[in-house]
């Protein structure tokens, strides 16, 4: 896989970055002082990988920020990408090349983004299910309240009818009692007149 890696010449890189050849050399030197190594061919000329170009592009952008020196920017980049100092790296038995670190970092970032997307989708699905369940429960409560209201209205109407019937009966009883009293009084009056005849 390393043999298939694309390499760029200094001319290609500074054209791509929009800087001069001397600026590219200066930026490469600054990165190398911080422990990053750009490989060189048999004639001692630098050969740039895609990862090298990414770092240099980042360095160009950072160095344009207010109060940011080239050295500060290089230190930040080396720290951000976890690039060890050359001397420390030589102590390692099998140091991981920077471009592999970069690829792993990109893959990890993609995995984290995908995991976040899946978690977000799951959360939205759970929220939807919970919302649906709450809606169903609210609908059942409303239906139950509606049924209860109808029952109460029916009971109230029955009680009203019963009260009306009771009042009607009371009036009828009172009317019958009044008539009976009138009849009794009329009979008594008649008997009294008979007594005097």
Swiss-Prot record:
SUPFAM superfamilies: Putative DNA-binding domain. GO terms for biological process: regulation of DNA-templated transcription. Keywords: Plasmid. It comes from the Bacteria. GO terms for molecular function: DNA binding. InterPro entries: DNA-bd_dom_put_sf, DUF3967, MerR-type_HTH_dom. This is Uncharacterized protein pXO2-68/BXB0093/GBAA_pXO2_0093. It comes from Bacillus anthracis.
């Amino acid at each position: 896989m390393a043999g298939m890696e694309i390499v760029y010449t200094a001319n290609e890189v500074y054209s791509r970055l929009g800087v001069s050849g001397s600026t590219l050399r200066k930026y490469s030197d600054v990165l190398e002082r911080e422990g990053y190594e750009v490989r060189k061919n048999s004639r001692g000329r630098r050969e740039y990988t895609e990862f090298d170009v990414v770092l240099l592009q980042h360095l160009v952008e950072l160095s344009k920020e207010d109060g940011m020196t080239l050295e500060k920017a290089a230190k930040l980049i080396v720290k951000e990408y976890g690039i060890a100092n050359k001397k420390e790296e030589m102590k390692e038995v099998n140091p991981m090349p920077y471009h592999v670190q970069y690829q792993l970092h990109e893959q990890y970032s993609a995995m984290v983004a995908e995991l976040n997307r899946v978690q977000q989708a799951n959360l939205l699905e759970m929220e939807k299910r919970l919302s649906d369940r709450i809606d169903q429960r609210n609908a059942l409560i409303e239906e139950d309240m509606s049924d209860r209201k109808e029952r109460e209205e029916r009971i109230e109407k029955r009680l009203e009818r019963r009260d009306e019937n009771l009042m009607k009966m009371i009036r009828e009883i009172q009317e019958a009692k009044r008539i009976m009293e009138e009849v009794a009084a009329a009979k008594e009056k008649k008997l009294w007149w008979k007594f005097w005849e």
